[in-house]
Amino acid sequence: MDENRKKALGAALGQIERQFGKGAVMRMGDARAVRGDVEVISTGSLQLDIALGVGGLPKGRVVEIYGPESSGKTTLTLHAIAEAQKAGGTAAFVDAEHALDPDYAEKLGVNLDDLLVSQPDTGEQALEITDMLVRSGAVDVVVVDSVAALTPKAEIEGEMGDSHVGLQARLMSQALRKLTANIKRSNTLVIFINQIRMKIGVMFGSPETTTGGNALKFYSSVRMDIRRLGAIKKGDEVLGNETRVKVVKNKMAPPFKQAEFEILYGQGISHEGELIDLGVKEGLIEKAGAWYSHNGDRIGQGKDNVRNYLKEHPELAAELEKQIRDKLLPGRAPSSEAQGTESGQEA
């Protein structure tokens, strides 16, 4: 670039900075240096953290989790909230469905005393509260449960049979236009839970769609499709569900990766079950018939017994997790560990 053009560009950049503040325009190399590695919040599932490619859900971004009823959508977000709190962060839950179970949330490791909860009356109120929490810059993760329950004020105040075509889609589109810049600026993770609906008269392709129009699909950096695969049984007793999450959109890493894990009733995602599956897959645990061994020592017969063994020996579970993370997520410690290291350095 010749000198005159350099001077003209420098003058323009100076004027933009004076008018709109420092950092309004910067060179991509500078932006990368300022931003560094993307900050993430763990999902509470080791397999899903690996499938996401960056070790968790990215902060400063919009994430959508959708799936059929009772597939584990709220469970997954409560685990993410618990992980954010473990790392010293603040979390908020906008409960538009008015269905949050505090006892279950506590069992998953959520600190109820520190969790901010809102049960708004209308969709506009829910999204306005979300925007105000984001703009405060003091909240690390905001969960909206769910998009389908964000009922526009006009619909609530109208009669039962009234037609309100496209109202919810317009509401979501307007809210996301306003929210995205604030989300990026405050480095807040905003998770929208969504439900599935069927499109009528679809001959080819999937008839499934999500509620609230197309805006959320465009604004989301990560979209995850969560499905229940089958029941986990002990005799006739059902202990939980086998669950699969497919990352259908990912702006942070290659998409379309899948994670399979177990959700146990009253306990949430089985961390030990994931360690067993990944340990066998990566050759850290040897499996011969029904027996599992680690470094030549037998640790149990059957997955259920090995799960109990790992619960009783947390040091072995921690060692396995470290080996798996070092192998599959090199250079990415879980957020709670990273936070602990930082506080140790500050001290």
UniProtKB/Swiss-Prot annotation:
PROSITE patterns referenced in this protein's UniProt entry, alphabetically: RECA_1, RECA_2, RECA_3
Disulfide bonds: none
Annotated positions binding ATP: 67-74
MF (Gene Ontology): ATP binding; ATP hydrolysis activity; ATP-dependent DNA damage sensor activity; damaged DNA binding; single-stranded DNA binding
Annotated stretches, region: Disordered: 326-347
Biased composition (Polar residues): 336-347
Places the protein is found: Cytoplasm
The keyword Nucleotide-binding belongs to this UniProt entry's keyword annotation: yes
Gene Ontology biological process: DNA recombination; DNA repair; SOS response
One GO location term (cellular component): cytosol
InterPro entries, per the entry: AAA+_ATPase, DNA_recomb/repair_RecA, DNA_recomb/repair_RecA_CS, P-loop_NTPase, RecA-like_C, RecA-like_N, RecA_ATP-bd, RecA_C_sf
Membership in a protein family: Belongs to the RecA family.
PANTHER family to which the protein is assigned, alphabetical: MITOCHONDRIAL DNA REPAIR PROTEIN RECA HOMOLOG-RELATED (PTHR45900:SF1), RECA (PTHR45900)
Matches recorded under HAMAP family: RecA (MF_00268)
Function noted in UniProt: Can catalyze the hydrolysis of ATP in the presence of single-stranded DNA, the ATP-dependent uptake of single-stranded DNA by duplex DNA, and the ATP-dependent hybridization of homologous single-stranded DNAs. It interacts with LexA causing its activation and leading to its autocatalytic cleavage.
Protein's name in the database: Protein RecA
Native species: Alkalilimnicola ehrlichii (strain ATCC BAA-1101 / DSM 17681 / MLHE-1)
